[in-house]
């Protein structure tokens, strides 16, 4: 296989909470040679994440200034390899986590390229969304059989995986939150024992009814009032894992913690011997191979399925539309862009 001399990619050209205005499709030169230890991938699908907005607004890396490439995860085909690459070959289908995945081609370290049997859209869920759930629950959530677990934004790209792992791998009682009855039915079908539609029900009230002794594990994606309600219902020795705060990424709104009794979040956690943990996947590179192998085994065994949102976007020029779609809350499953 050969590569063209030029290709298109999406770049961040200014820092802003508005993804559309801060990005632009540009044409770049593609070097003829691939560096040693690197793999050139022709990108077929790229995943859209809520955290794409953190990248374009400068929240993740304060000292990095535009222009820079964006997009975190992709699935594609290996078209060239550099010297010393042994884990993949030309023609292999791979998934990868790498900055700059909103591009027609990209060069990535060979160790980040994970072979998959087919080039299917759903495999794009694996590099960020699925690994975030698997690693966060295993390494930080310290989940054990019989735990009562709460997953917020449970029908999203990473929430759907967390639900299935908690139910079908760990053997937990799983509570999921969502914003529609359609999503509620979807969540029940993949393993949620209880679903709370926060548009029509009180999360605080329903948690009080469903788990009077509290929640053992919280997989928290939303932040704001959802975070407050979840933390108020932690059990003794609970583990709260923050993997996102999508409610504030666009607005920048900071919702202070509040409890009707006036108890502070620190005292609430202290008296329950509960832990509050942040989670950022790139800081767990050393365990990623183990968890990816586990995920592929769960897929093969049917314990986990990968769901892609029914609305698929086409081309780099549609990435901003895909980000808007994700933030509208209309999706369930992973939002994807078919790059080429």
Swiss-Prot record:
Provide the reaction this enzyme catalyses.
Answer: 2 a quinone + NADPH + H(+) = 2 a 1,4-benzosemiquinone + NADP(+)
Any single GO molecular-function term of the entry would be: zinc ion binding
Oxidoreductase as a keyword? yes
Q: What keywords were assigned to this record?
A: NADP, Oxidoreductase
Q: Which domain of life is it from?
A: Eukaryota
Which EC number(s) does the record attach to this protein? 1.6.5.5
UniProt GO cellular component terms: mitochondrion
A family per Pfam: ADH_N
Q: Does the keyword NADP apply?
A: yes
Family statement drawn from the similarity comment of this UniProt entry: Belongs to the zinc-containing alcohol dehydrogenase family. Quinone oxidoreductase subfamily.
Q: Which PANTHER family match?
A: PROSTAGLANDIN REDUCTASE 3, SHORT-CHAIN DEHYDROGENASE/REDUCTASE
Please report the name of this protein according to its UniProt entry.
Probable quinone oxidoreductase
Q: Tell me what organism the protein belongs to.
A: Leishmania amazonensis
């Amino acid at each position: 296989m050969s590569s063209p001399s030029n290709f298109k990619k999406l770049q961040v050209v200014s820092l802003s909470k508005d993804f559309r205005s801060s990005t632009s499709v540009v044409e770049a030169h593609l070097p003829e040679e691939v560096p040693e230890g690197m793999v050139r991938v022709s990108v077929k699908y790229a995943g859209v994440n809520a955290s794409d907005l953190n990248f374009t607004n400068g929240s993740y890396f304060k000292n990095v200034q535009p222009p820079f490439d964006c997009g975190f995860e992709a699935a594609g085909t290996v078209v060239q390899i550099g010297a010393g690459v042994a884990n993949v070959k030309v023609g292999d289908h791979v998934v990868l986590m790498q900055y700059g995945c909103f591009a027609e081609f990209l060069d990535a370290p060979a160790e980040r390229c994970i072979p998959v049997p087919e080039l299917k859209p759903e495999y794009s869920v694996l590099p960020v969304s699925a690994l975030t759930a698997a690693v966060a629950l295993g390494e930080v959530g310290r989940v054990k059989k019989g735990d009562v677990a709460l997953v917020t934004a449970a029908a999203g790209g990473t929430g759907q995986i967390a639900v299935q792992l908690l139910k079908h791998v760990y053997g937990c009682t799983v509570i999921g939150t969502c914003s529609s009855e359609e999503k509620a039915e979807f969540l029940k079908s993949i393993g949620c024992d209880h679903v709370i539609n926060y548009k029509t029900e009180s999360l605080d009230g329903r948690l009080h009814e469903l788990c009077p002794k509290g929640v053992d594990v919280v997989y928290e994606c939303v932040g704001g009032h959802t975070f407050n309600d979840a933390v108020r219902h932690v059990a003794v020795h609970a583990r709260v894992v923050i993997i996102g705060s999508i409610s504030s990424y666009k607005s920048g709104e900071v919702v202070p913690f509040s409890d009707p009794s006036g108890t502070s979040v620190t005292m609430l956690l202290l008296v329950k011997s509960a832990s509050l943990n942040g989670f950022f996947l790139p800081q767990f590179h050393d365990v990623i191979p183990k968890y990816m192998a586990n995920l592929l085994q769960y897929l093969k065994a049917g314990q986990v399925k990968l769901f892609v949102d029914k609305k698929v976007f086409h081309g780099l020029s549609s990435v901003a539309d895909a980000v808007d779609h994700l933030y509208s809350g209309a999706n369930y499953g992973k939002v994807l862009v078919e790059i080429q």
